[in-house]
Amino acid sequence: MRGNFMSSIEKLGGLKQRLTITVSAEEVDKAYKSRLLKVARTAKIPKFRPGKASPAVVEKLYGKAILQEVGSELIQSSLREAVEEHQLRVAGAPDIKMDKILRGEPFKYVVNFEVYPEITLESLAGETIERTQVEITEEDLDKMLEALRKQYAEWKEVDRPAKADDRVIIDFEGTLDGKPFERGSAKDFQLELGSKRMIAGFEEGIEGMKPGESKALDITFPADYPSEDLAGKAAVFNITLQKVMAPELPVLDEQFAERLGIKEGGLEALRQKVRTNMEKEVHHHMENKLKMAVLDKLIERNPIEVPESLIEAEIDHLQQMTRQQVAMQTHKPDEAKKMELPRDPYREQATKRVKLGLLLAEVVKQHKIKADPEQLRARVEEVAASYQDPEKVISWYYSNKQMLSEIESVVLEDQAVAQLMSELEVEDQAIPYEEAVKQIQQ
């Protein structure tokens, strides 16, 4: 018991605990009198000059409100002291239930809360993970350059039957049992054959058609089609082909390199730039894949219980991220804010994120890891490189403690993962570039 309050702790199972705190009647009266005098010194009351009304008058007008304020202040101070006394690591916001506060009587309240788990880290020694190595061949590079040529192709109208890789302009109307369905029709619709933008059978059915020709296609929607009204249903699409356009690819020469921003070095410099970009893309993905494998091992070796309050807070965060993404995609921020999202689909991801956060914090603490200034600078420069004035952005980050701390957290996480990597056995596995691209697209 402290001088002005008494507290008792009760373990409810798992990470849940309960504090019962009773503030003495003397402390209630002392706090009330102090607050009353403070209010009386500044209160503006009709017929009295500011601060000149007697405490009795102020009490008559504001006594109940003052008592409620005193209750809040006593909870704040006594709860902080009780947490220190019992050496509690409270996770999330506590749930406080208080009795009515009365002058001359002890003030009791109950606090239900969760604590952080006690973590004893298990080393990852003896565990093995695979590190994927990707070799980019000259053939891979040639294919990428060919894809770039297609991106910069000029489309010319041709008078012949449509074939794969052509761009076509069509009118179409879809029907179910002879009746048009919602979003099943379009006019002057542009489509590249072979893009797999449409359901199976649609693009293939247009191949061989001539400009001006009409055709009916019998197509069944996939059973897993997103719209339940259409999934698994047999439809008829009446299609009229308006135009066929074929790609005219640019020549792979110095002029083409200039179009892609290569001012010196011509075609050879372009090949090197494209190779570098390909390497960066697969390296970033494979590093992230390796990192996730390490973190999965960390969770497997260190099963911990996590506070439900932190999981719920993380679900809130993930849902907010979803709403922001929808707002960016739809350009309708007000509608996105009002979106009602179910919580259960986010629970597994939220639980994993909370576990990783707690475990990585323990890795940082146990190994006394500090954010490496050079790595921090490199991260800031990486972010700044995408802006028009990188130096200005770098200066802004270093003058903004909150933004810099966010990047510092990323650097600490990378260093923690590097520490975990040093404990593991790593086996290298080589895969072709095309396989790496498939993994990236999954």
Curated annotation (Swiss-Prot):
Molecular function, one GO term: ribosome binding
InterPro entries the record matches: PPIase_dom_sf, PPIase_FKBP_dom, Trig_fac, Trigger_fac_C, Trigger_fac_C_sf, Trigger_fac_ribosome-bd_bac, Trigger_fac_ribosome-bd_sf, Trigger_fact/SurA_dom_sf
Entry's localization field: Cytoplasm
GO annotation terms (biological process): 'de novo' cotranslational protein folding; cell division; chaperone-mediated protein folding; protein transport; protein unfolding
EC top class named in words: isomerase
Highest rank taxon of the organism: Bacteria
The protein's Enzyme Commission number: 5.2.1.8
CC per GO annotation: cytoplasm
PPIase FKBP-type domain: residues covered: 165-250
Reaction(s) catalysed by this chain's protein: [protein]-peptidylproline (omega=180) = [protein]-peptidylproline (omega=0)
Keywords: Cell cycle, Cell division, Chaperone, Cytoplasm, Isomerase, Rotamase
PANTHER family membership: TRIGGER FACTOR CHAPERONE AND PEPTIDYL-PROLYL CIS/TRANS ISOMERASE, TRIGGER FACTOR-LIKE PROTEIN TIG, CHLOROPLASTIC
Family to which this protein belongs: Belongs to the FKBP-type PPIase family. Tig subfamily.
Stored NCBIfam families: tig (TIGR00115)
Role: Involved in protein export. Acts as a chaperone by maintaining the newly synthesized protein in an open conformation. Functions as a peptidyl-prolyl cis-trans isomerase.
UniProt free text on domains: Consists of 3 domains; the N-terminus binds the ribosome, the middle domain has PPIase activity, while the C-terminus has intrinsic chaperone activity on its own.
Protein's UniProt name: Trigger factor
Organism: Coxiella burnetii (strain CbuK_Q154) (Coxiella burnetii (strain Q154))
